[in-house]
Design a protein with these regions (language model features):
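Solvent-exposed, flexible loop/coil residues
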Residues: 28, 39, 108
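Bacterial N-terminal signal peptides that target proteins for export
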Residues: 1-9
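Exposed loop/turn and edge beta-strand positions of beta-sandwich/beta-sheet ligand-binding modules
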Residues: 23, 39, 75
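N-terminal signal peptide c-region/cleavage motif recognized by signal peptidases
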Residues: 15-17
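Acidic, low-complexity Ser/Thr/Gly/Pro-rich repeat segments typical of extracellular/periplasmic
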Residues: 42-114
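N-terminal edge beta-strand
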Residues: 19-36
Length: 114
C-alpha cells in the first residue's frame, strides 16, 4: 500500500502541472465594461502566449484593428482600433499557442457608450 502511494504521488503531481494552462489575467477594456472610448485593446496572460489571430467584431461584423504585438510569445497582447469605435457592443476573440504547445482561445466583450 505504501509503495503504491509513493509511486502514485509523482504521477498526480505531474498531472496537475500538465493541466495548468495559460490563462487571461486581465483585459482592456475590462470584460463586460461600458466605456466612453477605446484607445487600446489589451489582453494580459499569466504566462507567455503567441497570439496567432485576433478579431474585433460589432454585431457580427469585423472591425479593423492594427496589431501592435508581433507573433512572438508575449505576456500582453496589444492592438488598436484602426478607426474610432462607434457606440455599440463589441467582442474581441483571439486564438493562440501557449508555451506548453497547447492551442488556446478566448475573448471578451465591452460596450462603447453613446
Amino acid at each position: 500500500m505504501i509503495r503504491t502511494t509513493i509511486l502514485a504521488l509523482p504521477l498526480a503531481l505531474l498531472a496537475g502541472a500538465a493541466a495548468a494552462h495559460t490563462k487571461t489575467d486581465a483585459t482592456t477594456p475590462a470584460d463586460g465594461a461600458t466605456v466612453a472610448e477605446v484607445e487600446m485593446l489589451r489582453i494580459a496572460f499569466d504566462a507567455p502566449m503567441r497570439v496567432i489571430a485576433a478579431a474585433l467584431t460589432r454585431d457580427g461584423a469585423e472591425v479593423a484593428i492594427e496589431r501592435e504585438t508581433g507573433m512572438e510569445p508575449v505576456e500582453a497582447f496589444h492592438a488598436v482600433p484602426a478607426e474610432t469605435l462607434a457606440p455599440g457592443t463589441y467582442r474581441l476573440d483571439w486564438r493562440g499557442m501557449a508555451a506548453d504547445g497547447h492551442p488556446m482561445q478566448g475573448g471578451f466583450g465591452f460596450t462603447v457608450a453613446e
